[in-house]
Amino acid sequence: MSTGTANSAVSSKSTNSTTSTSKVPVNEKSNNSQNANTSTASIIKSYREIVNDPKNLDEAANYLYQSLLDDAVVGVFLEIHHLRKTGNLTAMDGVNEDESETSFRIVDMPNFDIFGISTAKKPMDCTCPNCDRPVSAARFAPHLEKCMGMGRISSRIASRRLATKESNSASSSSSSSYLQTTNAGSDDEDDVDWSSEKRRKKSSQNSRNNGSKKNNGKTF
């Protein structure tokens, strides 16, 4: 008895659950169907009102025609405008035989695109801040070094100039010292000559005095 009652309870629960779960989509489907029916009914009602009244029918027909015409014209206009801006309109139309000689031709040359524009990289020019001359970008750094005297060659030239200046200053100082020594030697020689002349004068005077004394002491 207990097993039978348990099975009956389980079966009753399952039937209740299935009935409860099956009720929800049925209600949703019914609601959706009701909404669809009401929308279709409203559309049919408005259509009958328009058809029954000839004035409304003309307005509806004109509105439908104008909307279709606007869509078609605007679509074509936008497409042509896009082709014109991108340059594809002439490609679609093509070139006449008479205009083929005067029109642009496709260029098939190295370093040129199909329009004949050079694709090679153009050398960029830079302005030297020291001499304000345009110099190519590849030669800007060595030119700036030479122009401002900061390169290796210019540093060597500057060191040579300094060496020559130092040698010139050293030679001038040595020549001045030599002139000073020669001048000092000439002064000493002049002093020696003057003293020797003075001694000679003194010796000649002494000899004269001695001779006069001897002559005075003689007896005749």
UniProtKB/Swiss-Prot annotation:
GO terms for biological process: chromatin organization; regulation of transcription by RNA polymerase II. GO terms for cellular component: DUBm complex; SAGA complex. Residues 160-177, 204-220 have a biased composition (Low complexity). A zinc finger (SGF11-type) spans 126-147. Induction: By bursicon. GO terms for molecular function: transcription coactivator activity; zinc ion binding. PANTHER family: ATAXIN-7-LIKE PROTEIN 3. This is SAGA-associated factor 11 homolog. It comes from Musca domestica (House fly). The lineage of its organism: Eukaryota, Metazoa, Ecdysozoa, Arthropoda, Hexapoda.
